[in-house]
């Protein structure tokens, strides 16, 4: 949500999707962007159908953001990559910025990131953002990761209790149940604008391949 809000603050027309059938995250996307958003799911739709959804919904968009689900390669049954974020990136030819929880680790982060990149030759991972790190640590580890992994580190978010989405016994609160949700979005967006390289993300997005859309028969 922070990246979406930061992009919107730059007056970029963004369309957002959630990988998989999750209905809560798209509600947050709608709260941030003020437009209808949706889901892309390679379990329920093949590549052509997903292409048609994108063509239908993004005519006025300048940028499409797809939020992943679970671990990057985690798919159906917990033992496959089927319907994973990785599969969606392949189907849509989307460059991937990996979000990594960096709390409690240092050089091992480079090993984790490189391992994820090399697990599949076509991982499409071209950048990384670190979550839950201090500014001081980020300034030191950024160079290590870029040197070891060969991709840019596009910023970070510090650990901050105010960024957390309140939870309940059945899971995350829905946006219309959150008190001061607009303030929460603005807090995260302001942090993202300060610590995440939005211009770097836009440069990566500009390198996305053209997607060929097959008409429905």
Question: Across the structure, where does each feature detected by a protein language model lie?
Answer:
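Glycine-rich phosphate-binding P-loop
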Residues: 1
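ATP-dependent carboxylate-amine ligase catalytic core
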Residues: 4-92, 100-127, 136-139
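Short hydrophobic alpha-helical runs that function as membrane-insertion/retention elements
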Residues: 96-99, 154-156
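Internal gly/pro-rich beta-alpha loop/helix module
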Residues: 106-216
């Amino acid at each position: 949500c922070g990246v979406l809000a930061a992009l919107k603050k730059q007056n970029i027309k963004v369309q957002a999707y959630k990988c998989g059938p999750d209905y809560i995250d798209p509600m947050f996307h709608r709260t941030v962007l003020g437009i209808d958003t949706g889901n892309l799911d390679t379990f329920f739709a093949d590549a052509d159908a997903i292409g048609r959804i994108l063509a239908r919904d993004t005519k006025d968009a300048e940028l499409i953001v797809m939020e992943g689900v679970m671990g990057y390669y985690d798919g159906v049954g917990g033992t496959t990559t089927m319907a994973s974020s990785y599969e969606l990136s392949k189907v849509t030819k989307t460059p991937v910025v990996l979000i990594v929880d960096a709390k409690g680790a240092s050089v091992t982060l480079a090993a984790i990131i490189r391992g994820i990149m090399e697990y599949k030759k076509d991982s499409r991972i071209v950048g990384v953002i670190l979550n839950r790190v201090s500014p001081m640590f980020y300034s030191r580890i950024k160079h290590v990761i870029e040197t070891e992994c060969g991709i840019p580190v596009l910023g970070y978010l510090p650990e901050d209790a105010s960024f957390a989405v309140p939870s309940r016994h059945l899971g995350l609160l829905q946006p219309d149940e959150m008190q001061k949700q607009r303030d929460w979005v603005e807090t995260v967006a302001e942090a993202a604008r300060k610590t995440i390289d939005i211009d770097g993300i836009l440069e990566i997005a500009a390198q996305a391949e053209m997607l060929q859309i097959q008409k429905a028969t």
